[in-house]
Each structure stands twice: as structure tokens, then as C-alpha cells.
Amino acid sequence: MFEVLVLKIEDPGCFWVIIKGCSHFLEQEVDYQKLNTAMNDFYNSMCQDVEMKPLMLEEGQVCVVYCQELKCWCRALIKSIISSADHYLAECFLVDFAKYIPVKSKNIRVAVESFMQLPYRAKKFRLYGTKPVTLHIDFCEDNAEIVPATKWDSAAIQYFQNLLRATTQVEAKLCAVEEDTFEVYLYATIKNEKVCVNDDLVAKNFAYYVSPMGNKNLNPLEKPRQSLNSVTCSSKLSPSLTLWPMLLQGKDYHRMENKALNYKDSLTDSPKMMLEKQQQSLPLKHTEKCTESSVYWPTKRGITIYADPDVPSVSGSSQRPNEKPLRLTEKKDCDEKNGCVKLLQFLNPDPLRADGTSDLHQLQKVKLGTLQPGVVLRNRIEPCLTLEKSPLSADLKKMALTCLNSDTEDMKVAMEEMIPPEALQRNKFPGPSHTASYSWPPIARGCDMVVISHCGNDPLLYLPPLLTILQMGGCYKSLPSRNGPLAVIVCPGWKKAQFIFELLGDYSMSSRPLHPVLLTIGLHKDEAKNMKLPRGCDVIVTTPHSLLRLLTYRSLLFLRLCHLVLDEVHMLFFEANEQMFAILDNFKKNVEVEERESAPHQIVAVGVHWNKHIDHLVREFMKDPCVVITALEEAALYGSVQQVVHLCLECEKTSTLLQVLDFVPSQAQKTLIFTCSVAETETVCKGSPAEQGDKKTKSVLLLTERNASHAVGILRYLERADAKIPSELYEFTAGVLEAKEDKKARRPLCPYLKAFGFCKDKRICPDRHHINPEMDIPRKLSNKTLPVFGHIRVIPFYISNATNYFGRIIDKHVDLYETLNAEMNEYFKESSNKTSAEKVENLGLYGLEEKTLFQRVQVLEVSQKEDTWGLGSILVKLIDEGRTKLITRDQLLLLPEKFHTLPPQAVEFIVCRVKPADSEIEWNPKVTRYIHHKIVGKMHDAKVVLALGNTLWIDPMVHVTKLSNLKTSIIDYNVRAEILSMGMGIDNSEHLEQLKKLYKEAKLPAFEDLPCQTSIPTTVEDTVCLQGTQQGDGGTERGAGSQEDSDNQKPGVLSEDIGSETISSAPQPHGRSFHPQIKWFQKDDVVILKIKIRNVKDYKCKFFTDRVIFSAWVGDKFYLADLELQGDIRKDDCKCIIKDDEPLITLAKEKQECWCGLLKQRNPNVAFDFDHWEECEEDSPFSKVVNSKNLSCKVAALAESSGSSSDTTDGSESE
């Protein structure tokens, strides 16, 4: 017996090893090192010598070649020669390293005799007395049996490879030598148990034994081999051979082929019969010491299904020391032989279910109803069924218990999929979940890992074992000593990243400091460029877009990275496919450098769904990954099971099934039919008792009208499976979705549809996605309803997110809330009126004292738990401000009926045309905090573009500051521009378009029919224009009208204080012209003018060096604009086009400079376009505030200045 090191495996009949330890076959390792050094010195010095190159090349020739991979000269055998245009290419086998490599003819040298004295270092081995078998299926006879084969099955080879890979020590006992091949009994030590590999292959039906005597049982094609110990072989046998007494007596080869391994008999016997037979032949005490072997039987694409990991398996793969060896001449009858064969079959009755679980145990588990959920594995994994046996550090095991006992709702939600409800109630941790028991061990060993499960969004599937690896600092010592993370966790959104970051903070108390960093980088280049990681940061939690932006400026970020974790991998590839593969390419490039060979490199992907991108991830970026799938419908996608669906009526289901089976080939094959009831089962059995299924795995689904509730889910599954979907299913599903949408008529409008104009998945969203005229009528604040258009003043009190606020509309004339508030304060001044509510009802209206104010509140929820003083917590909503608050019961005051009459004054406001960047659907808290600090409690001016129910859509929303000394006002900021300036939001031009569609579908007035189409009150723009003109020209102009005047203006009427005249937009005689309203903004080299008229006919535009004349007809109205420009333009490069049904003029500047205004003379119909304000502020991460002291010419906050009132407003006339 000697120890060996396996170099290369082709199959159990051909593998190369290095002999270790003391043996008369072994040369000293130092001799090979000296040989290697001498060969390199010699051939490097003689590399240009023509005499050293062989004159001709032949297959089987011994030579010396240069190996690019090993960077040295090696002894080799030429296996084949291929000719090409400029040289010959030889496939060579390196005899000392057991490698096949292609070598150019110029790198082949003659083998010097002195270098060929030492034997080849790689020895060729094969298993002694062991031959391959295969499963032969006779479709005509409808049976299957295991028969001898001429070559090893791929499943046997892969099992053999996995078995040796899992060993800690491999030993061999030499039995024979045939030419250059050593025939051995191979022993592998697995978990301190020694297993005879020869026996194990036979016991698992991967091989059969042949007689060691002469040539009697040899295949006629095989050559006889020389026995090293022919005398002892006749009397001493391997302990495993005691189970095969008749086969070792030289029985006829063909008889063994037909009867020795009768597969059908062994499978048709019941477990009880098999148990009785094996008890008659051999007592079970001989197998009590058997241990579970590392079993792996791959089926399609390497899938193995393990039905019950809880049942300890019994295997015949270990040695049986208590059994006595049998002589070759000893004769047994046929019953004893069959009993021994069936004993092996009982120990592992079905090689297609190679988990070692007996049918008897399976039946017992089914009867008890405790069958564990299935799991599909790519490699054999030993699950950790308890926390004590899990591969976690002791501190983390304690932390798992502590986290579970936490009362925080977030932790309970995170554990929801992992811990059974009864365990949560008992506050006891039962151990890792079913999925975690398979995912933790490979991750803790540093293996590449893919986990697909229904609970695949749970970070606890990978976080504890990952933290365990990060505690072992020794494996990272070879990495460069610079700042950079060891692990990066990529999440599909900032919200999940925030949760994992907080979870890391909790777990870091039980580990060495990892200094995790939450990385969310916006669109601004400077933010990524100036980002600096703190020293000692070992873990980064981020999103794909943020990480890629950082990599753009920090190319060495992955220099120390060893662990890349992809959380919710299916969502990552769905929402950021290009970014993910860019990150993976960068990671692969960094970990494959030679300096990183000794450091770990691991990719862990955890998700809910399998898709083609994950398949590409496994093939291109992972090395021998472990794949765990506990969602069996996802395993079908992984296994490429063909999905077919047929739609039919319930009454036609049986006939449709028979039609499907008619397309089955004439030779009967296996079909498994699932039915909904016993009656259907009997009908199907009578209708087609002998029909069988397709040879290729196929799933055929019959969908009837009774399965309408499953139609949407089935369609989504078939889409992910890339199946051929009949058009009828799309129509059927559309009808189902429409019916579901009708049922949601009383549900609130989808918040995402309101905020952004779209919902990510209407099929699963519980809210409504259409306008209900009954529910969405603008509600009344008093005797007036909410405004559906026009300009308003608002004060936001509660900031839900960056674009969603709750507040009040301020009416300058009659503020009913102020009156109510004054009356409530006066009432509650009397201490006798402050009566606490004894009985609290849900949705009841009460009073609440806050500092010096009294608020009306509505009870939303009353807590069932009471504190020590008997005061339970109550969740209330302040109906006049929109915010919610948690208070105690004694804070509620009885509210008189007279204070109930005024409807709630809180209104919901949504800022339009902006949405989160990076395909997010939730605003980053950084933006929400900034906007909250900016706008809460302040008066703002806004334009209403839509009103539904209690919600107003506003665009724009600005903060205005009055300059009383100058009798004018300026705009401090535009809320939408502020959001965009943070770099966390992008333009959402489709927002209003989607709202228009909703309006049309609900048959409500179209947007164009709404009376108000003006922008911010002209007086506000005029005051800003005046400020810009004063800044640019240094002159003094008259102030525009006050802001109060603008509140009174009606749609289509713009009031000016110049001469106190009011100019109407009523239709005028044909002989007169109208001046169109114009919005403008500028870039470095051009100025853009938007003419705010639609349905234009016969438009003309003439360009001069300092002037533009535009004219057009709209219906029976003639519009004319003669604009004298502030600066010069290149008239040949200017153009006028129709875009979005409106004229758009582009003026090319003569010089690339910033204009402080558009016109030399002020025109009230020409205003700066504040919607493009942010485009002038790209260079700054924050928007510039317009004020009276510092007005930038670049931002030009800047409508136009005017010296006279000769020009008129939109619709005004000129002679």
C-alpha cells in the first residue's frame, strides 16, 4: 500500500498519479527537480542550435518541448501532428506532468539520452478487476437492465472525479502491471473513513468485477495482463469480493451479462421483500459501520435530485472487515448469488437517486407527511442540518440566536422565509433553513455558488458563511497592502443595499471590524471622482450603477477583491444587464493574474429565478460552481425542460390529452400524467393505458377556464422558459388581467403610477391602474373643490419622498383653516375643555396638543398591547397636515362637533417629470432629506396640471422671494431642478403623457381642453427678468406687478402694473396680428426658442445677424414675432422646425458666450424656460439660487426686460 497524488483523470480505467512516500517504484523528488533544472539550462543555452531540432516528427516520438504554461522545458510524447501554413503543430503529452498541450514545431527539441534516464514521473493507473457497465433500455420489452459496456459512462467518470476530489488521502495497492499501466485497488479517505473506490463503483452500479484468474472472464478484445502476485491472488481477495461469490468462480460471461445485474427485478421488488431477502443472506450487522459515501450521479446537465436530506443513508461503499474472504473454488447456488446482488441493490437500490435513501424510508416519510422539500444540486453537498454543525464561527452562531430574539420588525421580515412561524413565536432558532443548509457549506469553503430559491432574496443565505471566511485573515496575506475591499455585495437597489448594510452592522459585533461602506453614487462625475474609501474597509455594499461609476475613476478598486456577491441576481441581470457583465469582466481580469493564485476568488449569486444570464454567469465566470435549486419549477428551467401549453375547455380536457398523446412516437416511452382528481385519473387510465411520453423531457400543460387564477403566473413562467406561447394564452391572460383590474376599482390609485407615470408590474400590483371617475373626482376643501388647473400657493408639512408631499393650499382671500385653528386654540385655552378621550374608536376624530398648537387627528390604529401604566400606543394622522404620528392614549382630546365640519385640509402634491436614476422605483434618502430640509414649512408657488381625488400634480413648484425695496420678486429655486442637481434623479418626460392617456381612457377632458396653459405667473418671470437685466446692463427698470396681483389673474389674462391696464386674450379681428408666447433657454453655442402655439400652418422664419422675424397662421389667427436680439447670430446656421407640434427655433451664436438676456428690449411674452434651468448648471452638484445680490449670467434666471409696453401678451393685438 502506498500513497499517491492524482494528476489527471480520464476515466476509472485511465488516470495518472504521482507516487508519494516509500516505494521501490519511486524515485526521489529531488532527482526530478535536478533533472528539470539541468534540462532548462541546457535547452535554453542551445535554443538556436539547428542540430537540436528533430529532422522529422512522428507520432509516438519521445522529445523535449517548451511549455508556455509551465515556463520550462519538459519531456513529452508526440500524440498527433497537424500541418498549418507556416509550421507544424504537434499535440504532446508531458510525461512528468500528465498534461496534453499543443506545441509549435519550432519549440520541439531532440531528447538527449542523459535526460531520459529517470522514469516518467506521471504513472498511468487503472482500477484492478473493474469494468464499466451501462443501463440498457429495451423499449419493445419495456424493461431496463445493467449490462457490460466497452467504455466508461460519463456519469461514472464524473462520479469518480468528484469522489477523488473530496478525499483527503488517496492510497493504492498494486495488483498487476500491463505494459505501462499499473492496476490497483484504490482507497480514498473521506471524513476519516477509508473507502475502496473499486467497491464503491460496483455498489453504485457504475461497474462490475471480472475474475482475476487468467483470461477466463476477460473481454476477448483485451490483452492478458501480468499478475504481480498470481499465487496469492488465487487465495486472497479484496473484502468487497465476498459479496460476489458466484461471479468470481469463472461463470459464463454472457450469463453474467443477462442475469447477474437484473435491473428490473431489483427495482420491482418491494422494499419489504428486499429487506427480507437480504436478511436471509447476510445479517445487517455487517453494514452497521458503513458510512455515507460522497455520492453523485449526474443526470441531464448534471442534475441530481435529493428528496430527503434528513434521512441518514446507508451505502455499500465502505469496507466490511467482519466478513470472511471466500475461495475462488467455493460454489454457491443461484439463490444465494441473487440474494447478494439484491443486497447491493438494497444498499443503494436506484442509481438515479444516489442519495443512499432506501425506498422503505421514503415510504415511511411519505406516510408520516414529513417529506422535506426537494433540492436540485449540480455537485454533491453535505447539508448542515443544525446550527451546531454549520460552518460558522462560534461568535456568529451566538449572533444568529441573538438576532432572532430581536424584536425589530426588519429582522423578522428578513427571517420570514428562513424561520418557521412557530419557531419565531418560541424565540428559538431551529437551525439553518432548508436552502441555507445547502448554501452555507460551499460558501464557507470559498467555492463559487449559485442559489435559486423561493427565499432567494434573504441575505442570510450567504452572509453568515461569508463573514466566517472574512475572519480568516491568513488567506489574504498575499494580496497587495493597499486600501480596497475584500468583498463587494451588489444589490438591485439602494433599499436592499441599505438593509444589508444595517445587517452587517449587527453582525460586525461578533467579528473582527470589517468597516463596511454603503456606496450609492449619483450621476455627477465629481461625486465618483472624489469618492474615497475609509482605511480598513473590507466590505462594500452597493448597486451596479454606483459600482461601475466608481470603477470608472478607481480602476484599482478590485485589486484586493476576493468575494463578489450578487444579491437577487435575477433582478440585477434584468435591470442592469450591461453593467453587471462589465463588473464581472473587471473582476475576472483582476483575479486571474498570476499574483492572485494563492488568494481566494469567489462569486456567490443568490436569487429567486433562473434565467439565461445566470447560465452565462456559471459558464463564463465561475470555476466548478456549486448550484443549489430548491424551487423545482426553476430546476426545470435549469434542466432545459421543454414547456408546452394547450388551451381547452374543461369538458374537452380528456380528448385534448389523447390528441397530445397521438403525437408520441410509435415506440412506447415514459409519460407521467398529473390530474386534479381521482375520477380524472381513472378516466385517463381507461382512455390511454399504454400511451407513453416523448423521449426528450417535456412538460405539457392543459389549461382550462377553471385555471384562470393561474394563467398570469403560467404566462410569466413560459416567457422565462422561452417557450412557444399560443396567442390564445395572451388573449386569455389579457382577459384575466382586465377582470382583476375591474375588481380593483375601489382600490387606491397605484402610487408608482401617480409618482412616475408607470408601474413596474401591473400583473402583481394590488392597486388600481386606471382612473375611476367616481373615486377620482377632486374633493372639496370647503365649499370649493380642488383646483384642476392654474397657479396656487402651497405649504408642504410632510415630505413622503423627494417628489411626494402633503400640505395645505393657501387661499389669500379666505383661509378657513386659519379661522378654524384660531377657534380651536381659543376653545382649548380653557383647561376644563381639555378632556381626555376615554374610549378610542378607529377612524374617530380627536384633538391633539402639539406645543402651543392644537391639531385635528384621526385614529388609524390602536395598539393591542398596553404599557406598564395601561396607556397603549395609538397611530394617528394629522388630517390638516398629512403626517402620521404615534402617541399615547392620554394625549387624545375630545373634539366638539363644530370642529368636525371643515373637511381635512391636507392635500397630496406630486412634482411631475422627474424620476429616480438607475431604474430605481424608490427615491434615495439623501435626496428626500435634502428636499425636506429645503421646502418643509415654506410657502411655494406652483402650477397645477392635474387633480384627481385628493392629489394635485404640479409643474413647476418654485420658491419666490419678494424684494420689497425694489417692488419685485425673484425665484430662489425650482424643486424639480433641485432634485436633478443632486444627481439622483433623471428627466421623466413621459410622466404627463401617461397621465394624458389615463384621462383619455377615462373619457375625461383632454389636457388641451383645460383652460390654463400658461406657465408660472408672468409677474414672477418679469421680476426675475428685471433682475437679470439689471445685472447684465447695469440700468434701472420699473418693477413688475406684485405677486398678489398674479393670484387674481384668470386663465388667458396676464396682468401688468404698467399703466394698470389689463390686456385680454379674446379673439380679435382678422386684420390684426397676435404675438405668440415664447420660452427660451441657452447653451454654450446656441439659443433655443420654443413658440408656444400648436397646429401651425404656413409658418415663416427670417434670420438676420441681430434679429429674428417669425410669422405663422393658426386657424384664422395670424401670429407675428419680431425679436431684436441681445447678441449676434450666424444666420446661415440657424433653423426653425416643428417639434411636438410646436415651432422650435435654434439660433447659432456668433461667439460662444453666455447671454444675460435674449432681447434688447423687454417683452412680456418672452420668458426664460425654467424647465431647462438645470441644463445650465451641469457643472455644479447643487443648483444656483437666484438672488438680488448674485445673479449669474450663465443661469440667466432671466426672462426679458422691457422699456415700453408696446408689445403685448399672448393673444394681444398689434396694428
UniProtKB/Swiss-Prot annotation:
Its BP terms in the Gene Ontology are:
cell differentiation; fertilization; male meiotic nuclear division; piRNA processing; spermatogenesis; transposable element silencing by piRNA-mediated DNA methylation
Provide the alphabetized UniProt keywords.
ATP-binding, Developmental protein, Differentiation, Helicase, Hydrolase, Meiosis, Nucleotide-binding, Repeat, RNA-mediated gene silencing, Spermatogenesis
Q: What class of enzyme is it?
A: hydrolase
Q: Which residues bind ATP?
A: 453-460
Instruction: Describe the location of the CS domain by residue ranges.
Output: 1073-1159
Q: Known SUPFAM superfamilies for this protein?
A: HSP20-like chaperones, P-loop containing nucleoside triphosphate hydrolases, Tudor/PWWP/MBT
Q: What happens when the gene is disrupted?
A: Mice are viable but show male sterility with chromosome synapsis failure. Male mice display atrophied testes, with seminiferous tubules that are narrow with large vacuolated spaces, devoid of late-stage germ cells. Retrotransposons are derepressed due to DNA demethylation.
Its EC number(s): 3.6.4.13
Disulfide bonds listed in the record: none
User: Where in this protein would one find the motif DEAH box, according to its record?
Assistant: 567-570
Q: Transmembrane segments in this chain: where?
A: none
Does the record bear Nucleotide-binding in its keywords?
A: yes
Q: Which PROSITE patterns match?
A: CS
Q: Which GO terms describe its cellular component?
A: cytosol; PET complex
State if Repeat is listed as a keyword: yes
Signal peptide per UniProt: none
Please list the residue ranges annotated as the Tudor domain: 56-118, 809-909
Residues forming the Helicase ATP-binding domain are: 440-628
Give the UniProt tissue specificity note.
Answer: Restricted to the gonads.
- Extract the ranges annotated as region (Disordered): 308-327, 1027-1071
Catalytic activity, as annotated: ATP + H2O = ADP + phosphate + H(+)
Spell out the molecular function terms from Gene Ontology.
Answer: ATP binding; ATP hydrolysis activity; nucleic acid binding; RNA helicase activity
> Function of this protein?
Probable ATP-binding RNA helicase required during spermatogenesis to repress transposable elements and preventing their mobilization, which is essential for the germline integrity. Acts via the piRNA metabolic process, which mediates the repression of transposable elements during meiosis by forming complexes composed of piRNAs and Piwi proteins and governs the methylation and subsequent repression of transposons. Involved in the secondary piRNAs metabolic process.
Sorted alphabetically, which PANTHER family does this protein's record hold?
ATP-DEPENDENT RNA HELICASE TDRD12-RELATED
Q: How does it assemble?
A: Component of a mRNP complex containing PIWIL2, TDRD1 and piRNAs. Component of the PET complex, at least composed of EXD1, PIWIL2, TDRD12 and piRNAs.
Question: Mind telling me what this protein is named?
Answer: Putative ATP-dependent RNA helicase TDRD12
Ranked from the top, the taxonomy reads: Eukaryota, Metazoa, Chordata, Craniata, Vertebrata
